[in-house]
Amino acid sequence: MEGRNNLFPVFLKLEMLETLIVGGGHVGLEKISGLLKSSPGAKITLVARHIQDDIKALAHQHPSVRLQERNFRLWDIWNKDVIILATNDRKLHETVREFTRSKNILINVADTPDLCDFYLGSIITKGNLKIGVSTNGKSPTIAKRMREYLEEALPEDTNVLLDNMQKIRDQIKGDFNEKVKVLNEVTSSWLKGKE
């Protein structure tokens, strides 16, 4: 269906998965920075013939990041769960995409939506609240602007609200349906109080 985003958002526990990034330039820096900002303990291997100093500095701050300054080899994919390609080599991207498809490994290819299994959306984090924004690969700039807007709009005490809701949830007795009913009433009254 045209005009509808059919992507399904998923929040991955990257500290439990092995991620490979291929590319050590500006785009590689953007990808690894985004992953580490959201998941500081992410297990990442970055392979590139040349790795920017900014990436090396970032890796130095994160012990779960391994850098390999050499040419990428197809066997680098071995035992990886998620692949991110951040090079400008379309032929390499197509070769790797074909291989990952045969192995059921998820892949993202920077600025190449037709080769992607998933997109890296724009992420808003306020304490334990995390919101992902996707434009279905059409405009990362719009996703970025939405992120900026939501970061400003969400209250700084969002985490306090979440902690309070967890306490209420933990105290509610009854079956699942009863808990949902009570939590809906609590959040509904909170939203009415904000109007």
Regions found by a protein language model. Name each.
Residues V10-S33, N164-F176:
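Glycine-rich adenosine-cofactor-binding loop
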Residues V82-N88, H93-Y119:
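ADP-ribose/adenylate-binding Rossmann-like module
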